[in-house]
Each structure stands twice: as C-alpha cells, then as structure tokens.
C-alpha cells in the first residue's frame, strides 16, 4: 500500500478543519504579540503589538512601561487570565485612554 493511499484514508472532518481555520489567526496574533523576555538589556519589551480588541474580562492586569532610555515609546502589556502576555497597540483609541489614565496616576 502506497503512502498516498494511506493519507487518502485519513481525511479530517470538515468541522475539525473549520475549527483549525478559526483558531489559527488567534494563535498567530498571540504568539506574534508576546512580549520578549527581558534579560536586562536596554531595549523595548514589546517587539510586536496587537491592535485587536480584547475583552476586559479576559485581562487580569495591565502594565505600562513608560518611555525612557530603554525604549522611546510607552508600552502597554496585558496579562490574560490564561497567563499569557500581550503587547497592546498604543495607537488604538481605547488603549490610548488607558495609558493616559495609568501614566497620570
């Protein structure tokens, strides 16, 4: 039996394919927007940001890193209930308001 014949018999269900297609953008967005681990060097923590809206119920904490010698722009990092961290795009109007309020306090 050839390998092609074996793989023809292993067809995933349409529901499974649809689920994979629906989850793929979310996984890519979260992994691409993850803050880099800090190793003490003077650089921005957030290399890539996410502009997608995240429901406030999913966020456990927000951290604002002010602009300074390490990075020219303020950074907004959300920690989600599942423990993952996402760098949020500070140009999104909602996130601009959050940064302004946090920097004023």
Swiss-Prot record:
Signal peptide residue numbers: 1-29
Residues with attached carbohydrate: 31
Residues binding heparin: 96-102
Any Pfam family hit: IL8
InterPro entries named in the record: Chemokine_b/g/d (IPR039809), Chemokine_CXC (IPR001089), Chemokine_CXC_CS (IPR018048), Chemokine_IL8-like_dom (IPR001811), CXC_Chemokine_domain (IPR033899), Interleukin_8-like_sf (IPR036048)
Subcellular location: Secreted
Listed GO MF terms: chemokine activity; CXCR chemokine receptor binding; CXCR3 chemokine receptor binding; heparin binding; receptor ligand activity
UniProt-listed PROSITE patterns: SMALL_CYTOKINES_CXC
Disulfide bonds listed in the record: 44-71, 46-87
Residue positions, PTM Phosphoserine: 61
Top-level taxon of the source organism: Eukaryota
Keyword terms: Chemotaxis, Cytokine, Disulfide bond, Glycoprotein, Heparin-binding, Phosphoprotein, Secreted, Signal
Chief location bin: secreted
GO cellular component: cytoplasm; extracellular space; platelet alpha granule; protein-containing complex; vesicle
Gene Ontology BP annotations: adenylate cyclase-activating G protein-coupled receptor signaling pathway; antimicrobial humoral immune response mediated by antimicrobial peptide; cellular response to lipopolysaccharide; cytokine-mediated signaling pathway; defense response to protozoan; immune response; inflammatory response; leukocyte chemotaxis
Modification after translation, per record: O-linked glycan consists of Gal-GalNAc disaccharide which is modified with sialic acid residues (microheterogeneity).
Stated family: Belongs to the intercrine alpha (chemokine CxC) family.
Self-association state and partner proteins as the record states: Homotetramer. Interacts with TNFAIP6 (via Link domain). Interacts with CCR1. Interacts with CXCR3. Interacts with THBD; this interaction enhances generation of activated protein C.
Chain's role: Chemokine released during platelet aggregation that plays a role in different biological processes including hematopoiesis, cell proliferation, differentiation, and activation. Acts via different functional receptors including CCR1, CXCR3A or CXCR3B. Upon interaction with CXCR3A receptor, induces activated T-lymphocytes migration mediated via downstream Ras/extracellular signal-regulated kinase (ERK) signaling. Neutralizes the anticoagulant effect of heparin by binding more strongly to heparin than to the chondroitin-4-sulfate chains of the carrier molecule.
Protein name: Platelet factor 4
């Amino acid at each position: 039996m050839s390998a092609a014949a074996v793989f023809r018999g292993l067809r995933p269900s349409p529901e499974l394919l649809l689920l994979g297609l629906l989850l793929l953008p979310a996984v890519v967005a979260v992994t691409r927007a993850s803050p880099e681990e800090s190793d003490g060097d003077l650089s921005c923590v957030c290399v890539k940001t996410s502009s997608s809206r995240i429901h406030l119920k999913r966020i456990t904490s927000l951290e604002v890193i002010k602009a300074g010698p390490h990075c020219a722009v303020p950074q907004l990092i959300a920690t989600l209930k599942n423990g993952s961290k996402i760098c949020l795009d500070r140009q999104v109007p909602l996130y601009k308001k959050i940064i302004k309020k946090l920097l004023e306090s």
